[in-house]
């Protein structure tokens, strides 16, 4: 596991604007801040009677979800519709991929429908990067989660949640707790927090759920929950990803909750104004107590609201970056012909 797994040139156009959104690795602090600022401006749209702006009118956004996720798919659909885009959601279970069609063939057929942007979720790490390398240069690709690798929009909505509740990342202590090994959210959060200047990033997990080389992310590692939670400002809980586990990693869910579950008593070890986050879906009584998930320090539902704004920001910025690159390429061709 290394924190250097994305090719920056593929994600950005020649002017340094967002073109694809595949990973937070390699993206500069200024760009992450621009995404947060843009999302902040879109939060107001959600409070309007008519929740629409015309930024993507005439554009088609295609959600290609090879992995189920009600929350991510729905918020991407809402984000695109609030930007006035036409939205197609591919039901992969009934698509030609289940009949043996390759991923590239599926995307070529979608391109023939004149889609301008793909939002891709896939069980294989690197799938979004592969797609971005093989689609038409006019199409933007957004990673909605790929294997264990990355979930960049979740990472950014978590950063927006933290910034709106804590003001900035300076002097913050943030703890990420649970199944770090299988979590693409953990990877994206660690990269984002480091880039945005968070000075104290902690990961708390049993040794069997910690990936090798995690120290390269500039984090402090704790296997004792009580020690790791002491005086933190933010607690990000992660679910146990049983579907990605092979036997022997955990004795039982009950044992995990006993050692790493976030209870009211454990939360008291954090700062009194600490916030509690979770990317969902929540496993109550496994990684978090209901009293904490529904309590006054929980901002879990805020994360869902902020997720729409972040995805609006990413969709609009990537489309703008693609348009700018087409203009750059067109001008280059004109100069060569003169």
Curated annotation (Swiss-Prot):
Binding site for carbamoyl phosphate: 71-72, 121, 151, 154, 280-281
Disulphide-bonded residues: none
Pathway(s) annotated for this protein in UniProt: Pyrimidine metabolism; UMP biosynthesis via de novo pathway; (S)-dihydroorotate from bicarbonate: step 2/3
Keyword Transferase: yes
Residues the entry annotates as binding L-aspartate: 99, 184, 239
InterPro entries: Asp/Orn_carbamoyltranf_P-bd, Asp/Orn_carbamoylTrfase, Asp/Orn_carbamoylTrfase_sf, Asp_carbamoyltransf, Asp_carbamoyltransf_Asp/Orn-bd
Enzyme Commission code(s) on record: 2.1.3.2
Pfam families recorded: OTCace, OTCace_N
PROSITE patterns: CARBAMOYLTRANSFERASE
One GO cellular component term: cytosol
GO terms, biological process: 'de novo' pyrimidine nucleobase biosynthetic process; 'de novo' UMP biosynthetic process; amino acid metabolic process
GO molecular function, one term: aspartate carbamoyltransferase activity
Gene3D superfamilies per UniProt: Aspartate/ornithine carbamoyltransferase (3.40.50.1370)
Reaction equations catalysed: carbamoyl phosphate + L-aspartate = N-carbamoyl-L-aspartate + phosphate + H(+)
Keywords carried by this UniProt record: Pyrimidine biosynthesis, Transferase
Family, similarity comment: Belongs to the aspartate/ornithine carbamoyltransferase superfamily. ATCase family.
Summary of subunit composition and partner proteins: Heterododecamer (2C3:3R2) of six catalytic PyrB chains organized as two trimers (C3), and six regulatory PyrI chains organized as three dimers (R2).
Biological role stated in the UniProt entry: Catalyzes the condensation of carbamoyl phosphate and aspartate to form carbamoyl aspartate and inorganic phosphate, the committed step in the de novo pyrimidine nucleotide biosynthesis pathway.
Protein known as: Aspartate carbamoyltransferase catalytic subunit
Native source organism of the sequence: Stutzerimonas stutzeri (strain A1501)
Lineage start: Bacteria, Pseudomonadati, Pseudomonadota, Gammaproteobacteria, Pseudomonadales
